[in-house]
Amino acid sequence: MSEHDHLDDLRAVTAGSLALDGLAPDAYARDHTAFEALSNQRRLIEDWLVDRLASSSDASLSVLAVGCGDGALDAAVAERLLASDPAGRALRYVGIEPFETSARHFDERMGRINSDRLSFDTVVAPFAQTSLDETFDVVTFVHSMYYVPDVAEAAHAATALLRAGGEALVLNAPRGALNLLAGLLAPAIEGHQQWFSDDVHDALTCSGLDVAVPAPIEAVVDLTDASDGVLDFTVQATLTPESRCLVRRYLADVSLVAGRSVVAHPVDVFAVRGARVPSSAPT
């Protein structure tokens, strides 16, 4: 059977039944960590962010991480930025995370970084419900734009928090072979399906924002021996035994490596620019 046959089987299995349950916050956090361990994507994102943020020439750098999770990515980025500039600029990090346990881990990870040039805060709330009294050089949405009610509103809110010359960076999954599963099986979030890259691109470009699209980050994930929980995270739903079996067969069919379930795991990047730095007045 082809991957299309397995997708058709999944559609048939789910068509006559209630929508699959979503993931409980604790299970989401646990299985997210396990999923990331099977992919090289997070390290590639870390490298990309370090290069992007290090290119700023400002005397200090402030970052707002929307949907920061447990801080594994942001703490690694912060440590590398500080280490690469040992006598240099101050670094400010603010993480927004609705899940309290993950937010606490973000706070703990940042607190373990031994540098008096780092300051940080954590806000436990959805992005739409936050009220911040500071501005930032960079706002990041790393795999978090899926969950906002309205992409354009979130992007406009992010750009309103930018300093002159700043940018919002949205890193989002395309609707490729891997995420066809989530598109088919994941339950709605606050009345909408998860936003994939085509949705994000359309929302950003149609809302009048200044958007650049750098090259995607190409990665792979090896789900050959993935646990049931990791498969649930992969599709963003709690699978039934029957649907889980079909998911495993589908992954084997779309694998880049014969005899395994190694699947393309790319991430697209959107750079939304804030207001330009005002030019100097003529003399």
Question: Where do the PLM segments sit?
Answer:
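A short glycine-rich, Lys/Arg-flanked "PGG" loop and its adjoining helix->strand segment in the class I
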Residues: 152-167
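Class I SAM-dependent methyltransferase SAM/SAH-binding core
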Residues: 62-129
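Conserved class I S-adenosyl-L-methionine
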Residues: 167-195
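Conserved Class I S-adenosyl-L-methionine
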Residues: 210-283
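Class I SAM-dependent methyltransferase Rossmann-like catalytic core
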Residues: 2-56
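A short acidic, Gly/Pro-enriched loop at the edge of an enzyme's catalytic core
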Residues: 128-139
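A short SAM/SAH-binding and catalytic strip from SAM-dependent methyltransferases
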Residues: 137-152
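Short alpha-helix
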Residues: 192-208
